[in-house]
Each structure stands twice: as structure tokens, then as C-alpha cells.
């Protein structure tokens, strides 16, 4: 995968393959959680059940708020014979789970799959950023206002506040185009967003 391919890719699988061994387990698990939520979006009959519990427990686990045993118990119940513990495989399996709900009408199946792949590829970029241009946070940006703002965005999933974060970062002296553009983008932001994680010191 080249940088240009990364920026334009509409299939998350080669992107995940490129990231393998280059990123954290936490990031991969958060992507898998998004895929699980996409699956539940297509399956409202399961949205209040074990699938939703698995997504919520995984998010708590990656933030140290749930034990491995608690997470593993829910994971095994959900995935049954799917026994891989490697987060990379969970991310790949998540893609297949999200896409499988597109198999509703053979006449439009390929279009539906392509559309869902494009959604997932955009979320890969939101969570992992551009691996060809890593960005470091300047401590000068981490004012009390920005820290409070970004903490609230993460805790509340209040991604509608991202443009406000961009303005605050600019006021603090941030002129990084990648960060500011991402914050102001209308693309979907999710738990694990690379800018939010960067400012919170999460990997």
C-alpha cells in the first residue's frame, strides 16, 4: 500500500493488512467494535442483546475498565468457534460481519458491499490516521481548555465538537494541516479517532 492508495482506498482489508504489526491492539479492537456496531445497525433485533454487550465491554476493556476475563467471556459467547485472540483477526472478522448484512438482495449485493467497504475504509483512516505521515502532539497545544474538550469528546462520543476542537487548537498555536483538516472534516469520527487519541496520549 502506498500513501496515495491509503488515502483513496475503498476496501479496508488491504489497509488492515498494511497496519498489521504496525499499530496497537487497542486500535484494532476499537475498529472491530465499530464493525460490530455496523452489524447491529443492520440487525436491530440484536441491538439490545449480547452483540451490544460485546461492543460495550470491548470499549471498556481497551480503556482498562473491564478485566480480560470479563471481555473474553463475552467474546467467546459472541464468536463461538471463532477462537482467534489476535486483534488483527478480530478486525478482519469484523469487516466480514459488517458486510454480511449486505447480502439481502442479490440484484444489488455488490453495490451494497462496495458501499459498506467504503464506510469501513473511511473509519480505518479515522482511527489510524495516515501511517505515512505520523504526527506528534506539541505540549503547548495541551491547554486546560483543550484537555477538557478532548476528554469530553472521547467520553461522550461527542464528535460534533471536533470543529470546536480545531478552533481551540489553532488558538493554541497548532498549524498542522492534517490535524485541523481532520477535525473539520464531515467524515465520520468514532471512538479511537487518531486526533483525539493523539491529544489524550492513547495508542
What annotation goes with each model-predicted range?
Residues 1-203:
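Structured binding/interaction patches within domain cores
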